[in-house]
Amino acid sequence: MTTIVCVRKNGKVAIGGDGQATLGNCVEKGTVRKVRRLYKDKVVTGFAGSTADAFILRDLFEKKLELHQGHLVKAAVELAKEWRTERSLRRLEAMMIVANESEFLLVSGSGDVIEPEFDVLAIGSGGNFAKSAALALLRTNNELSAAEIVKQALIIAGDIDIYTNHNHVIEEV
């Protein structure tokens, strides 16, 4: 379990996640890097769910990005199609948020590719806490940047969700 949150504000997109990995009810590691840059550092992805499954999906997404020359939506849709139809991938338990400088999407194992209605997406066990905090800050605080809103949302999620820690990685595109 984890928290990944993505915010768009003033032409910037920031995505961040915590670093906690659990096995059952035990914390196995607190410094997992769940947010990574891809495709010439122009795309950032964050994952929630099974770590091994997420790495497989991230690698597949990176291949789709290369194939489609960095076109985020096309790569995400093609990944979702393959995820749903390829028998070996159907059992993978993970979700991803993918972002570039102008758009960001949620990609799920059920084949969903969702563009946010508002300028916030969040996934993982602390996702609803982070989304609520980010939406509130986005609507009421004009001084915070996208990255600062992501940081505050992750702090709040980590204070509430036992599967989210305070070791954050935040990237901005």
From Swiss-Prot:
Pfam families: Proteasome. Its EC number is 3.4.25.2. The keyword Lyase does not apply. It is an enzyme of class 3 (hydrolase). The active site is at 2. Allosterically activated by HslU binding. GO terms for molecular function: metal ion binding; threonine-type endopeptidase activity. It is found in: Cytoplasm. Na(+) binds at residues 158, 161, 164. It catalyses: ATP-dependent cleavage of peptide bonds with broad specificity. Keywords: Allosteric enzyme, Cytoplasm, Hydrolase, Metal-binding, Protease, Sodium, Threonine protease. A double ring-shaped homohexamer of HslV is capped on each side by a ring-shaped HslU homohexamer. The assembly of the HslU/HslV complex is dependent on binding of ATP. Protease subunit of a proteasome-like degradation complex believed to be a general protein degrading machinery. This is ATP-dependent protease subunit HslV. It comes from Mannheimia succiniciproducens (strain KCTC 0769BP / MBEL55E).
